Amino acid sequence: MLISTFVFLLYEVTALSTAIHVTKSYTHTRTGTSFFMYQKEAFYRGRSSTRQFNNTRSPSGRSASRSSNFSHRSSSRDSFSSNRSYSSSLSRSPEEPLRTILVENLTRNVTKEHIAEIFGIYGLIDHIFMPIYKKSELNKGYCYIEYVYHDQAANAVDKMNNAELDGEELFVSIKRFPFESLHKNHKHYENSYRPSRSQNNSHYNDKSFHRSRYSRARSRSPGSNISEYSDQSPPYHSYRHRP
């Protein structure tokens, strides 16, 4: 009886110790698992936080770089537009008055020397361009005259428009002509003529030259003057200017 009781108690003690050991091991295991889970959760939290930090930082960095690039581009565009507006304002600035006149309806007998002599009355001529035919070397019916001053060109238009030269009515107007292109095209530049300063000064300043060179003849209408060359000039070359 005692033996059976002792065996039963020993069995109970063994079972109790086993239960305590299992409980401790389960507790430790659970604690370790929870600690491991805690560390794992903390690790993933750290990675997510770093990812979140990087994700939140990288767009801002990109946006900052993009904004800086955009601001740089916008500033460059603004400077370009300002320069462009400045150049356009310069190009739109008031230009100088035109000093070039166009003389049309010339007879083929008229030469550049005749034009320089007649139109030199009204001012200092800087350049004359008269296109001519290569074979006949006669003019094509018009010429450009560039004066030194714009008021002289206006005076020539006022006096010589609708005037007669060699029996034909002239049509004189102020026009723009690209004289700079003549220097590039030498063939056309050969047809140009530039009076010397001595000729300009003598024709423009010496009024007695015109009085002796041209003789007053007859008047077709009241208030109009007809002047023609004297016997020293070719008989075909006569001109009548407006009063």
From Swiss-Prot:
The RRM domain, residue ranges: 99-177
Subcellular location: Cytoplasm; Nucleus
Compositionally skewed regions (Low complexity) per UniProt: 57-92
Region: Disordered, residue numbers: 48-92, 189-243
Subunit composition and interactions: Component of the active spliceosome.
Compositional bias ranges of the Polar residues kind: 193-203, 222-235
GO CC annotation: ASAP complex; cytoplasm; cytosol; exon-exon junction complex; nucleoplasm; nucleus
Protein's UniProt name: RNA-binding protein with serine-rich domain 1 homolog
Chief site of localization: cytoplasm
Organism, scientific name: Schizosaccharomyces pombe (strain 972 / ATCC 24843) (Fission yeast)
Xref: SUPFAM superfamilies: RNA-binding domain, RBD
GO biological process: mRNA splicing, via spliceosome
Native organism taxonomy: Eukaryota, Fungi, Dikarya, Ascomycota, Taphrinomycotina
